[in-house]
Amino acid sequence: MTPHILSRELQRALRWQCQQVFGGTHHTHWFEGLLTKLRRVDSVQASRSVFGNSTIARHAAHVLFCLHVMNTDPDRPPESVDWGQSWGDVQIDDETWADLLHLLTGEAERLETLVGTLQTGPLSTDRLLLIINQLTHAAYHAGAIAQILKYETYLNQDVAEGVQEAKVLI
């Protein structure tokens, strides 16, 4: 692949994107980053399967796995990774949820550091695409988690309204 030139502007944009994807927009509330969203979730909520298959904890563990693979060996061919194990069963209690969040925060910081320490100058297309892919991937999972949380809120409201209606009938 032909190397591209990493400008300071592109480097700054990628670092800003890291901050947005994981932290969100702190000055407005239109987007909560992945870590900001996960810090509002407790271990019970993270373990609950709302749609009957995936949980918030599984999404978080999957993103952690993917970031760790990239941060540890960014030149590793994607086909050499057993991506299926990233969706393994995740048993969460308060301690393991706190550990998962701590590890995920560390990997997000490693990605931002990687972007920040890239030297301006030649950058392989593969490396650039890998960074952009990780940011897009984490943003996708932030959105998936947001949908799980909204659906869970909807279910809780629907159940609460149903209980209120039942009380009226009694």
Predicted features along the sequence, with ranges:
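Short, contiguous alpha-helical
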Residues: M1-T28, L35, S43-S86, G121-I170
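Acidic/histidine-rich alpha-helical segments that form the ligand environment
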Residues: G88-A139
